[in-house]
Amino acid sequence: MSPAGKGPAWRQPAILAAAGAAHALSFAPDPLPAWSLAPVQVIALAVAAHASLQAPSARRALARGWLFAMFSFSLGLYWLYVSMHDYGGLAAPLAAAGVLALSAFLALFPGLACAAARWLCPPHWDASPPARARRTLYTAATWAACWAALEWLRAVVLTGFPWLNIGYAHVDSPLAGWAPLLGVHGMALLAAFAAAALAGLWQSASGRIDSRQALAAGVALLLAGAGWLLGQFSWSRPEGKPLHLRLVQGNVEQSQKFDPALLETGLRRHLELASLPPRPGEPKPDLIILPETVLPVFQDQLPASVWDAWIEVARRADTRIAMGVPLHTQPDGATGHRYTNSVIGFDASTPVEQLRTGTTAMRYDKQHLVPWGEYVPPGFRWFVDMLDIPLGDFDRGAARQPSFDIAGQRIAFNICYEDLFGPGLLPALQDGPDGRPGATIMANVSNLGWFGNTWALRQHLQIGRLRTMETARPMVAATNTGITAAIDARGRVAAALPAGRAGVLPVAVQGMTGLTPYARFGDKPALALIGLLLIAAPALG
């Protein structure tokens, strides 16, 4: 019998709840230091692995995995309360209930993973020592494959919400070396294997560590070592000269951003920041990037004088400007209207009429829209109306859109949480069917002001770092309230502005070319490995 079954009835739920809360701390260095995130994640998840694998039934394993994940998601996503209550105007009990309801739904995926692993790998404590050692390896592989498979499902079901995928806890661990090959889901597989291997070291029948069960842990260490070696390899090469960018962080308070009475104040702040002269010795920017919805109304609702002012900024600085703006357009030959969350690019020669009609040559329309925030799922109009979300029903952008050609570099934009979905970024990095080369730099524009100065900002930066590791492309992030940053092609933060402050970040970004295996094949290799383990490991064990 497992020690998990001994002691008072409340002990195991309390341990799982505490482990789940600790697990939430492993995503982004706040409040824990960066070096501790990966060990905390593996140790906390090992508690869930041990408890679920020693459950008396698959149903009990589901309950244990769900409880662990419920506490992990509830704490890790607490910042959703801020958006719903502080800025959405939802009553505190309803906002808290919203966070708990979402966490309960998301926790079903880990719960089902634990149930599947328990069903495929029943406890084997009564087996002979050699058989127990062999089965520990296969059990760890099966449990990891189940967990990673459900992480992937969480990324695609109902448009997907893969925030807090366990792979993100390892951006500073040796497992990050696997990112260019297997992506975040492959890293999740390896992290889950390490946790299950750690759980397998504990021989519950005697309460002592059994060295004969260390095989899986040894394999986990070998995989970490291989990841470190892979991390020394350069998967891309420089192209052209570094691009000089100015990233603008306006820090407009979310409660004021969509207030019509304060529209001019926000516009003036961004104009002033964009117009700042370069510091002594600092080259002029090739491009000024401003955040998502820096103009909080549709472009055709602004007078021509506003666009004249922006064109004047571009003229004085002798540069181009890219900004996030909601667009209202009527495509040629179409009878309907189109509303998109977009990024537009322009310079001093761009006619004002193009800006007012949304027909600029450089334009990106957001593809992966936020449910309830940017589009209304069927039957949920009442919820969106209750939150009073502005600009809440957009059309989707095309799957592949042209990059912005700036001074010999090609920039692929994404908006808000689109960088959470790695496969969606890949078409822009690959050569097009027309022979057009892929992008050399990625750029994210966001407005995270909805979440205050919370963990969401650090978690989002962590997500961006992993995207650069997967693709070996640098990424810059221009955000309203933070964290505005430049990340190099190895996932290192080269420069960043403090959250919650207005300012500009001048950076030189070296564009890169060449495709990593992940950039070429996406999640397919990781999914193939997960599928192979799900078929082979239980049979061999």
UniProtKB/Swiss-Prot annotation:
Gene Ontology CC entries for this record: plasma membrane
This protein's record includes keyword RNA-binding: no
Pfam families reported for this sequence: CN_hydrolase, LNT_N
Residues passing through the membrane, by range: 31-51, 65-85, 89-109, 144-164, 181-201, 215-235
UniProt key word ATP-binding: no
Pathway: Protein modification; lipoprotein biosynthesis (N-acyl transfer)
Ranges where the CN hydrolase domain occurs: 248-511
Broad EC category: transferase
Enzyme Commission number(s) of this protein: 2.3.1.269
InterPro entries in alphabetical order: Apolipo_AcylTrfase, C-N_Hydrolase, C-N_Hydrolase_sf, LNT_N
Membrane association type: Multi-pass membrane protein
Gene Ontology biological-process annotations: lipoprotein biosynthetic process
GO molecular function, one term: N-acyltransferase activity
PROSITE patterns according to UniProt: CN_HYDROLASE
Protein name as catalogued: Putative apolipoprotein N-acyltransferase
Lineage, top ranks: Bacteria, Pseudomonadati, Pseudomonadota, Betaproteobacteria, Burkholderiales
Gene behind this protein: lnt
